[in-house]
Amino acid sequence: MVCLKTLSVFLAAFAAADARAVFKTQGHKNSEMIPDNYIVVMKDGVSQDDFKAHISSVASIHSTNKAKRGTNTQGMKREFDIMNWRGYHGHFDRDTLEEILNDSKVDYVEQDQVVRISGLVTQRSAPSWGLGRVSHRQAGSRDYVFDDSAGRGVTIYGVDTGIDINHQDFRGRARWGTNTADRDNADRHGHGTHTASTFAGTAYGIAKNANIVAVKVLGSDGSGSTSGIIAGINYCVQDAQQRGILGKAAMNLSLGGGFSQANNDAVTRAQNAGIFVAVAAGNDNRDARNYSPASAPAVCTVASSTINDSKSSFSNWGPVVDIYAPGSDIIAARPGGGSTTMSGTSMASPHVAGMGAYMIGMGADPRQVCDRLKQLATAAIRNPGSSTTNRLLYNGSGQ
């Protein structure tokens, strides 16, 4: 009888421990954590009603704790629902966090962190070479050879610093989506306009006929938060679903931060929903496995190459890199008109996002596009990095 009681106590303790959510810690030493801000992810299968009940309960707990202890925490900030992957972002005191972790409906919690663009501005007069390179097996051509469908009927979401949707390079194909970064819908940085011009600009872009949606998740200094990125991804999936374009959409994320399971899960859900997702590998010349969303297995992770088919000195590398694309000295549009030159894996990723849209426009399934691009790619990159592919983006033009 004593043994049975002991066993019962042990099993009860084990069940309680098993019910507690995991608090995930990001492993990259350079991660910039945002104090008292957390991303909470619910377990698969939690219904909408149970999710709303949990949200209401947390709001009540936070309100009580705030009144009792006089904290300056702000409570619930954003909710996420990406194809039934549910969660939220909030600013909570430690006691409220403990209550959240003890809820059996919660899968895991991670601290929010700073996310930044993956681009570096360089001289403004450098020549454009990326388009010619991705349409020829051999380096050196300035001609861009492509199918004239050029992404027609496909929508690309630019998740970035915003986009100057009135720039002449977009010819009326760009529209505003949402802003999770600040209250200013303009692209004050220029990064988002440049990347959009690269994936779908009339003069500088790969998919010259694709539609463009501005999703602003980074501010004028090029930084944002993981929670803001997830909110932007959430918008993209819901917008594509409402417009009936899942399967005819792509997304570019020329940004990154330390490893984040929530960020990786969000982009994975978007990819699985029918949106081709291209992401920058990062600019620290390190293993991209330590970065998000670059480390998400489901997305197409892009490293940067030079005009000489070498790895760009800044580019991250590693086994999670799917493909290389031009990223050094890339000329494209700037806000207000005209063009400028930037370098970074931020410039490489939109080449792949645009090429994904190009392939989707010709009938490819977004879920299979990255594999198709890797099959087409040219084995051209010298010194690609340890355990890293040497495959360079190619559009299959036959040139």
UniProtKB/Swiss-Prot annotation:
<feature type="domain" description="Inhibitor I9">
    <location>
        <begin position="38"/>
        <end position="117"/>
    </location>
</feature>
<dbReference type="InterPro" id="IPR010259">
    <property type="entry name" value="S8pro/Inhibitor_I9"/>
</dbReference>
<feature type="glycosylation site" description="N-linked (GlcNAc...) asparagine">
    <location>
        <position position="102"/>
    </location>
</feature>
<dbReference type="Pfam" id="PF05922">
    <property type="entry name" value="Inhibitor_I9"/>
</dbReference>
<feature type="glycosylation site" description="N-linked (GlcNAc...) asparagine">
    <location>
        <position position="395"/>
    </location>
</feature>
<keyword id="KW-0325">Glycoprotein</keyword>
<feature type="signal peptide">
    <location>
        <begin position="1"/>
        <end position="19"/>
    </location>
</feature>
<keyword id="KW-0964">Secreted</keyword>
<dbReference type="Pfam" id="PF00082">
    <property type="entry name" value="Peptidase_S8"/>
</dbReference>
<dbReference type="InterPro" id="IPR000209">
    <property type="entry name" value="Peptidase_S8/S53_dom"/>
</dbReference>
<keyword id="KW-0645">Protease</keyword>
<feature type="glycosylation site" description="N-linked (GlcNAc...) asparagine">
    <location>
        <position position="308"/>
    </location>
</feature>
<comment type="similarity">
    <text>Belongs to the peptidase S8 family.</text>
</comment>
<dbReference type="InterPro" id="IPR036852">
    <property type="entry name" value="Peptidase_S8/S53_dom_sf"/>
</dbReference>
<keyword id="KW-0378">Hydrolase</keyword>
<dbReference type="GO" id="GO:0005576">
    <property type="term" value="C:extracellular region"/>
</dbReference>
<dbReference type="InterPro" id="IPR015500">
    <property type="entry name" value="Peptidase_S8_subtilisin-rel"/>
</dbReference>
<keyword id="KW-0720">Serine protease</keyword>
<dbReference type="GO" id="GO:0006508">
    <property type="term" value="P:proteolysis"/>
</dbReference>
<dbReference type="InterPro" id="IPR034193">
    <property type="entry name" value="PCSK9_ProteinaseK-like"/>
</dbReference>
<dbReference type="InterPro" id="IPR023828">
    <property type="entry name" value="Peptidase_S8_Ser-AS"/>
</dbReference>
<protein>
    <recommendedName>
        <fullName>Subtilisin-like protease 4</fullName>
        <ecNumber>3.4.21.-</ecNumber>
    </recommendedName>
</protein>
<feature type="propeptide">
    <location>
        <begin position="20"/>
        <end position="118"/>
    </location>
</feature>
<feature type="active site" description="Charge relay system">
    <location>
        <position position="191"/>
    </location>
</feature>
<dbReference type="InterPro" id="IPR037045">
    <property type="entry name" value="S8pro/Inhibitor_I9_sf"/>
</dbReference>
<dbReference type="InterPro" id="IPR050131">
    <property type="entry name" value="Peptidase_S8_subtilisin-like"/>
</dbReference>
<feature type="active site" description="Charge relay system">
    <location>
        <position position="160"/>
    </location>
</feature>
<dbReference type="GO" id="GO:0004252">
    <property type="term" value="F:serine-type endopeptidase activity"/>
</dbReference>
<keyword id="KW-0865">Zymogen</keyword>
<keyword id="KW-0843">Virulence</keyword>
<feature type="glycosylation site" description="N-linked (GlcNAc...) asparagine">
    <location>
        <position position="252"/>
    </location>
</feature>
<comment type="function">
    <text>Secreted subtilisin-like serine protease with keratinolytic activity that contributes to pathogenicity.</text>
</comment>
<keyword id="KW-0732">Signal</keyword>
<feature type="active site" description="Charge relay system">
    <location>
        <position position="346"/>
    </location>
</feature>
<feature type="domain" description="Peptidase S8">
    <location>
        <begin position="128"/>
        <end position="399"/>
    </location>
</feature>
